[in-house]
């Protein structure tokens, strides 16, 4: 049985050997004379491609060399960095402006509700005063951060105070003093 299997293995090896022999390359295909064509080794104990080109066989070390290539690293594009910074600033400024608008809107809604309410008392102004204080704080923070111009901030604060004064006059809680006229 072992003899039959050895015969099959040897016949298969011979057929593979003949097929691989047809695959060998001629030296005319490789202009480099150091490359040899690949051939099949008849002896199985030797390496499979004993006459082939091996990169490990011709490796020679000439010495130590240190290569520093700092110049090849590309410096980050400053225009792209400025674009990224502008985008983050835009989002922050947008959030601050939105906060200011939201706080002002809450004050105006509360003042409108109080103006429409009949029989309102002065104690109902306390929560509105707190809302106005929060709006002032948001406006002042936006000015400090550079999101709003100080004149715009002053105009918005004045608008809040004027609307509060209109509600107070409407309910009779405040009577404006007449300015003396000089003749």
From Swiss-Prot:
Coiled coil: none annotated. InterPro entries: Ribosomal_bS20 (IPR002583), Ribosomal_bS20_sf (IPR036510). GO terms for cellular component: chloroplast; small ribosomal subunit. Keywords: Chloroplast, Plastid, Ribonucleoprotein, Ribosomal protein, RNA-binding, rRNA-binding, Transit peptide. It is found in: Plastid, Chloroplast. Its main location: plastid. The keyword Transit peptide applies. GO terms for biological process: translation. Residues 79-99 are annotated as: Disordered. Component of the chloroplast small ribosomal subunit (SSU). Mature 70S chloroplast ribosomes of higher plants consist of a small (30S) and a large (50S) subunit. The 30S small subunit contains 1 molecule of ribosomal RNA (16S rRNA) and 24 different proteins. The 50S large subunit contains 3 rRNA molecules (23S, 5S and 4.5S rRNA) and 33 different proteins. Component of the chloroplast ribosome (chloro-ribosome), a dedicated translation machinery responsible for the synthesis of chloroplast genome-encoded proteins, including proteins of the transcription and translation machinery and components of the photosynthetic apparatus. NCBIfam families: S20. Belongs to the bacterial ribosomal protein bS20 family. This is Small ribosomal subunit protein bS20c. It comes from Spinacia oleracea (Spinach). The gene is RPS20.
